[in-house]
Amino acid sequence: MKIVVDKNIPYLKEALERAGHCVTAMPGTAICKSDVADADALFVRTRTRCGRELLEGTGVRFIGTATIGYDHIDAEYCKEKGITWCNAPGCNAGAVLQYVQSVIYARYENVEGLSLGVVGVGEVGSRVAEWAEAAGMKVYRNDPPKAAAGMLGLVSLEEIAEKCDIITFHPTLVRDGRYPSWHLAGEAFFASLRHKPLVINASRGPVVDGKELLAALERGMVSAAALDVWEGEPDIDRDLLDRAWVATPHIAGYSLEGKYNATRMVLDAFAAFAGNGGIAMPCLPGVENPLLAVGCERDALLGIYNPMHDTSALKNSPCDFENQRNNYALRREVTAYEIVVKG
């Protein structure tokens, strides 16, 4: 088959070529209709919007997005045209968990007794909540769609605003319908805060209204903001960037393990679509120094990944957002190391 792929999806081009396919790799932001005119399949990330404008009149019959989110895929159009598509749910949940852990530990030496609000308890949010409880935090979970489906133990967003020292956002981006998450954290949310929380957004930029967050920071309603995602990426609000405590270029999910998982998932879906056997991928490499001797979990997590380094890079060169994201040196997750706690 003729296949067009985003060149920044690791292992993908090589795996498809070894399976006998004709593959063209290019930047995701550059993919246009002429590139996919005679393609049978398309593999993308969030930067490639897949709808009528790109796909009308082309030969594309399969789209794989190597991401958890899929708001860049026009599902209705694909259904209308009989185009099969897949995403990679949960592929980088471990990486985003690692990011949130490192952000929290960079802010607090001791997390026991803190209250954490988790907005959205899907693959990522549920793992964040489980870790936080194990670390001794009081956790409040919010997820209206899951509450409507019968999940117990959930609270309102208002209760989280009233009770939490840290609030982290992990919902799917939904623009309309019964449970929209677009600007979920808006003027009313920030006005109802009671504990001047640390606010973390590693989901989608528009989940948090950037202008209202900036106003809340300026008024002291929010003590600090840790932002990995931004409205208008890659052209981000410079004033909000200046006020953000942690500011990274949409790389919370960028671990080698997460990228590997995503590629594996979309390849499996493509193989099922094409009616072929599985497509082989190489094993993940080991790390150079896998043994970590540390005093506590905090030391281990910040030793593996400290978000302040990426923050410095983005604040020093905000115009370089997309380049920093596309050329990010994929970090490794905790599972790649053997951790020994001293004493």
Label for each model-derived stretch:
Residues 1-39:
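N-terminal glycine-/charge-rich "phosphate-binding" loop or analogous flexible N-terminal tail
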Residues 196, 202-343:
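Rossmann-like dinucleotide-binding domain for NAD(H)/NADP(H)
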Residues 97-113, 134-135, 264-273:
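Oxidoreductase and adenylate-handling cofactor-binding alpha/beta cores
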Residues 40-111:
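Phosphate/diphosphate ligand-binding glycine-rich loop within oxidoreductases
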Residues 10, 134-151:
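NAD(P)-binding Rossmann-fold cofactor-contacting core
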Residues 50-51, 146-238:
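Rossmann-like adenosine-cofactor binding region
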Residues 7, 97, 114-133:
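Glycine-rich adenosine-cofactor-binding loop
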